[in-house]
Each structure stands twice: as C-alpha cells, then as structure tokens.
Amino acid sequence: MPNLLQKTRKITSILQRSVDSLETELPYNTMASRLADIIDCNACIINGGGSLLGYAMKYKTNTDRVEEFFETRQFPDAYVKAASRVYDTEANLSVENELTIFPVESKDIYPDGLTTIAPIYGGGMRLGTLIIWRNDNEFSDDDLVLVEISSTVVGIQLLNLQTENLEETIRKQTAVNMAINTLSYSEMKAVAAILSELDGNEGRLTASVIADRIGITRSVIVNALRKLESAGIIESRSLGMKGTYLKVINEGIFDKLKEF
C-alpha cells in the first residue's frame, strides 16, 4: 500500500502540468479523479459561484436529481452559499448536516454517508470548494492531510490560470491598441464598416461594395485589413470573385470600435 508520502507526491505532481494542459470544460477532472483513487472516495471541485470544475464518481451515491447537478455543471445556490461559509476543512459530516452531498431522498439508503468539505484559497482569496464523500468509513487523518494538500494545489492552479488569463487579456488589448494607432481615420471608418458586415466573428465580404457604400477607395479597405492581419487581429482569405473571407481572432477590436 502506498504510504502518505507517496500519495502526497502523486497529488503534488499535478503542479508539474502546465495550465495549458487543463481541459477546457472540466479543467480539474484529473485532480478529482486522482484524489478519488488515492483516498478511495467520490470527489468534486466547484468554484466560488458553484460551477463544477471537475469531478470523479467511484461509487454510485446520488439520485437522478443530484446527477443533474453534475450534468448541468452547477450546484444549487443554497448549497454554494452554505459551503462558502466553511473557512476550514469540515470533516466527516453526517447525512443530517446541511453540507452533506447526499440528497435527502438517499439518507435512508446511505445512513452512514460522510462528507468532507475543504475551502480552496489562492492569493488570500476564496476561489472554490473541494468536496469528497463516502458511503461509509470515516476519513482518516492521513486522508484529511491529502485533502488539505489537494485544496492547496488546486488553489495554486486556479490562481495561475487567473494570472495567465489576465496576461492574455492584456496582450490582446495591447495588440488592438497598437493596431488601431496605425490606422488613419479613413481606415478606421473602413474597419468599422467591415466588422459590422460580419455574422458574429466571421463572414464573407466584398471590399468594393463596402468602399462604394461608405465613400472610400477599395485600397483603403485593403490597407486596413493588412494592418489588422499583421497585428494578429484578424485572419483573411481571398475567395476570388466571391470576395474575402474574414475571421476576427482578437475580439478586443469590437470594444475598441465602440469608442470610434
């Protein structure tokens, strides 16, 4: 049997994975699955708003109603509010406790069900909650040590993810500002007209038609598109006689045009 140190290493090895390796929809499924295997329990991770970030169900303990929470990836507001008031790990909560993960209709089926809740912090902020549960058998002190470590690891990853997202937002904003600063008034007018033609973030357009409508030359539109493409704001592809296919890859340009 793996000892506590070996189990700890399995959990902390998650930190060696880059943020880019996290799944888009349920980024912490791997952490939840690893914790569930190591501690022999069910596990889930939610953010501060109750959105599901990852889960692992080793054992069937829930009803269709509760399974729906996992399918919709959103926990009930009442439960989320109650969990947010837990500031330190609450271990081995019975099925009678308001924080039990076991549904009311399952209390008779799993009378010995136990839930443990650990808050997730990062940078001094509450970022979410880690929840684990069993049909029976208390969580030992070793189990709880692993829970504390897991919540810390997830907190670090959540903080890193927030930092990377912020850096990406700043990078995109900077790229848009630099691109806008290279455009003349006529080119800005052309860009505004072009993007208003798109169906969402992409679509087909004909430069000559737009040029005639707003009273500028076709070359102004071509120059504006080249500048945006070189700045990584858009992607374009010639469709020959059908015009040009355009796709916006930096949506910050839309916000900037609102100021125009």
UniProtKB/Swiss-Prot annotation:
MF-aspect GO terms: DNA binding; DNA-binding transcription factor activity; GTP binding
DNA-binding region: 207-226
Gene3D superfamilies: 3.30.450.40, Winged helix-like DNA-binding domain superfamily/Winged helix DNA-binding domain
Compartments, record wording: Cytoplasm
Keyword Cytoplasm listed: yes
Keywords: Cytoplasm, DNA-binding, Repressor, Transcription, Transcription regulation
Chain segments carrying region GAF domain: 1-159
One GO CC term, this protein: cytoplasm
Any one GO biological process: negative regulation of DNA-templated transcription
Xref: PANTHER family: GLOBAL TRANSCRIPTIONAL REGULATOR CODY (PTHR40062:SF1), GTP-SENSING TRANSCRIPTIONAL PLEIOTROPIC REPRESSOR CODY (PTHR40062)
UniProt function note: DNA-binding global transcriptional regulator which is involved in the adaptive response to starvation and acts by directly or indirectly controlling the expression of numerous genes in response to nutrient availability. During rapid exponential growth, CodY is highly active and represses genes whose products allow adaptation to nutrient depletion.
Protein family: Belongs to the CodY family.
Name this protein carries in UniProt: Global transcriptional regulator CodY
Originating species: Streptococcus equi subsp. zooepidemicus (strain MGCS10565)
Taxonomic lineage from the root: Bacteria, Bacillati, Bacillota, Bacilli, Lactobacillales
Gene giving rise to this polypeptide: codY
